[in-house]
């Protein structure tokens, strides 16, 4: 398969305050559920309908192809096909996914559909500079598993044989519970629950998708936990998704120093090596140019220069991977470290490839 060089299309079907702050203006909301509650169902759905119509266009796909990209990772919500719940109502986004699939085919771009939300939440939402601490209660909800499997099956049924479909990611970055010590576990979804879900989800989507389409699961930040997973002959074209960020928590690094830059790139290489050692082809499903700037005297121009060097070095470190998806294609305020039009658009095509 051709190496995957892509971008995420975050904020299109799942409104993100850091991508499109105008959607949240004067509401006090920080996620889709809060936004709907603040606005009321009818006003919320009308605002989202306008957003779905205008946020992405065919010209975006043309520009992606123009700078050398050949894939998009498209986060979709559990209510992709619409939902009428007692406390909330969501309109379907499938007509807009149809457009993405058609535009992608026109410009020789492949689409990875990524189930990015589930009822109750899957936890580790690590895709933005300002995401609140997420909650993982999906495995405890009464119908969460059924809803997730249902939307995956319907996505595979509708798009499984589409020429431009790269594949389906079964669940975006679930927070997995692992051993913190001999007798204690971290918060999150039990590993056995995720493994069983992934096996069942694989069976469902593969029944609609030919074997050349990939099925992706998240490492959940612990690649070694998956060493002996999905090893039977019936599992075809299964990829692992690894996310690599350097802007917060213990991974926050100052890239204005040579040591900080070297440490970040060494971490990329180390974690990629660990993931690849499991035997799965590995995709860096999310990464960005975001990092820490400890030197307050760095000018905006200087910051852009540091980020450009950081991005170029990260691209080189991803060489062993089967591909990558920058986070994200576009932001309303054109945030340089997170907006591929700024971050990748000025790079020479050879650096991306």
Where are these regions (language model features)?
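Active-site mouth of glycoside hydrolases
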Residues: 2-6, 14-212, 219
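Short, loop-centered acidic/histidine patches that primarily coordinate divalent metals
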Residues: 77, 81, 285-288, 329-330
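Extracellular glycoside hydrolase catalytic/binding regions
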Residues: 150, 157-160, 164-167, 171-320
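Glycan-binding loop/region signatures in secreted carbohydrate-active enzymes
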Residues: 4, 9-54, 264-272, 277-284, ...
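Short loop/turn segments at secondary-structure transitions that flank enzyme active sites
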Residues: 13-15, 246-248, 330-333, 346
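Conserved residues at the C-terminal ends of beta-strands
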Residues: 10, 75, 171, 243, ...
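Aromatic-rich peripheral "rim/lid" segments of glycoside hydrolase catalytic domains that contact
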Residues: 299-353
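Conserved beta-strand termini and adjacent loop/short-helix elements that scaffold enzyme active sites
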Residues: 114, 218, 243, 327-329
């Amino acid at each position: 398969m051709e190496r995957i060089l892509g971008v995420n299309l975050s904020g299109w079907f799942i409104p993100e305050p850091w991508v499109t702050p105008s959607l949240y203006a004067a509401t006090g909301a920080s996620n889709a559920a809060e936004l709907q509650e603040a606005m009321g169902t009818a006003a919320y759905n009308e605002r989202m309908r306008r957003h779905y119509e205008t946020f992405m266009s065919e010209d975006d796909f043309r520009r992606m192809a123009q700078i050398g990209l050949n894939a998009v990772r498209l986060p979709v919500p559990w209510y992709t096909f619409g939902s009428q719940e007692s406390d909330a109502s969501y309109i379907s986004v499938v007509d807009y996914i149809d457009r993405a699939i058609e535009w992608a085919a026109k410009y020789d771009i492949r689409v990875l559909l990524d189930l990015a939300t589930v009822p109750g939440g899957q936890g580790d939402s690590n895709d933005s500079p300002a995401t609140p601490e997420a909650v993982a209660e999906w495995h405890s909800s009464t119908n969460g598993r059924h809803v997730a499997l249902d939307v995956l099956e319907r996505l595979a049924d509708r798009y499984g044989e589409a020429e431009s479909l790269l594949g389906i990611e079964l669940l975006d970055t679930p927070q997995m519970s692992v051993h913190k010590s001999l007798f204690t576990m971290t918060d999150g979804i039990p590993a056995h629950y995720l493994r069983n879900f992934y096996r069942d989800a694989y069976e469902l989507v593969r029944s609609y998708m030919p074997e050349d389409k990939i099925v992706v699961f998240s490492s959940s930040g612990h690649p070694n936990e998956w060493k002996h997973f999905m090893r039977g002959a019936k599992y075809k074209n299964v990829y692992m998704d690894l996310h690599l960020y350097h802007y917060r928590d213990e991974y926050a690094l100052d890239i204005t120093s040579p040591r900080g830059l070297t440490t970040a790139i060494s971490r990329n290489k180390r974690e990629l090596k660990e993931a690849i050692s499991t035997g799965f082809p590995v995709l860096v499903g999310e990464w960005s140019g975001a990092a820490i700037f400890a030197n307050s005297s760095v000018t905006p121009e200087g910051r852009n220069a540091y980020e450009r060097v950081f991005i170029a070095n990260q691209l080189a470190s991803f060489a062993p991977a089967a591909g990558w998806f920058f986070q994200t294609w576009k932001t309303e305020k054109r945030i340089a470290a997170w907006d591929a039009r700024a971050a990748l658009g000025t790079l020479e095509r050879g650096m991306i490839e």
